[in-house]
C-alpha cells in the first residue's frame, strides 16, 4: 500500500502544492495578488531583503518551508479557519517521474518551481498548473544513491534557481527559462 502511494506521489505532490500554495486555490484571490503574479512578464529579481522578509510575503513562497525559520506559515488572508474546509484541488500536474516525491515547491511571481527524482526541475504557472519549462540534468555514470533518487527542491536568489544533483553537482538555472 505504501509503495503504490509513493508511486502516485508526482501527482499528489503537485495537487497538494496547488491547494496549499496557490493563492488562487480558494477562488477568492485579491486583485493585488492576481496583479502581482506576473508569470511571463518582468520577473523581479529575488533579493536578500525579499528572502529575509519571506515569512510575511503573501505573493511568494521563497523558501523551503516558507522562511528561514522553517515555519511553513503562509500569510495570505483568503484562506482562513472558516473556509479552509472548502478547499478543493485547483489543478493537477503529472510529471514524467513515477518515483517518490520529497520536494518542497517554491513560488516566485506566480511561477511554481518543483523538482522530482532523477534531477528534473519544472516551472509551472501557479494559477493553472500549466508547464512553462522543464529541465533535466544529465548525470554521469552513477549507479547508487543514498536514500533513493530524491531531490528536496530548489533555492532562489537573484534571477537564478539552484539545486543539488544526485551526482554531486550544484546547478544554477535561469528562473525564466
Model-derived features: positions:
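Extracytoplasmic beta-rich repeat domains
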Residues: 93-106, 134-155
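Boundary at the C-terminal end of the N-terminal hydrophobic targeting segment
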Residues: 25, 29-31
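Short loop/turn segments that connect beta-strands within beta-propeller blades
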Residues: 126-128, 175-177
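Bacterial N-terminal signal peptides
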Residues: 10-23
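Aromatic (tryptophan-biased) beta-strands that constitute blades/sheets of beta-rich domains
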Residues: 32-95, 130-143
Amino acid at each position: 500500500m505504501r509503495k503504490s502511494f509513493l508511486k502516485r506521489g508526482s501527482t499528489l505532490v503537485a495537487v497538494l502544492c496547488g491547494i496549499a500554495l496557490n493563492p488562487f486555490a480558494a477562488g477568492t484571490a485579491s486583485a493585488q495578488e492576481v496583479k502581482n503574479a506576473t508569470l511571463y512578464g518582468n520577473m523581479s529579481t529575488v533579493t536578500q531583503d525579499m528572502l529575509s522578509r519571506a515569512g510575511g510575503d503573501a505573493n511568494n513562497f521563497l523558501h523551503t518551508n516558507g522562511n528561514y525559520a522553517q515555519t511553513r506559515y503562509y500569510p495570505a488572508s483568503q484562506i482562513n479557519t472558516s473556509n479552509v474546509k472548502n478547499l478543493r484541488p485547483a489543478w493537477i500536474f503529472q510529471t514524467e517521474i513515477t518515483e517518490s516525491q520529497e520536494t518542497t515547491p517554491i513560488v516566485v511571481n506566480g511561477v511554481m518551481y518543483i523538482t522530482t527524482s532523477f534531477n528534473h526541475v519544472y516551472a509551472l504557472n501557479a494559477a493553472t498548473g500549466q508547464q512553462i519549462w522543464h529541465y533535466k540534468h544529465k548525470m554521469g555514470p552513477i549507479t547508487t544513491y543514498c536514500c533513493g533518487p530524491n531531490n528536496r527542491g530548489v533555492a532562489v536568489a537573484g534571477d537564478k534557481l539552484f539545486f543539488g544533483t544526485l551526482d554531486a553537482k550544484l546547478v544554477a538555472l535561469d528562473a525564466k527559462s
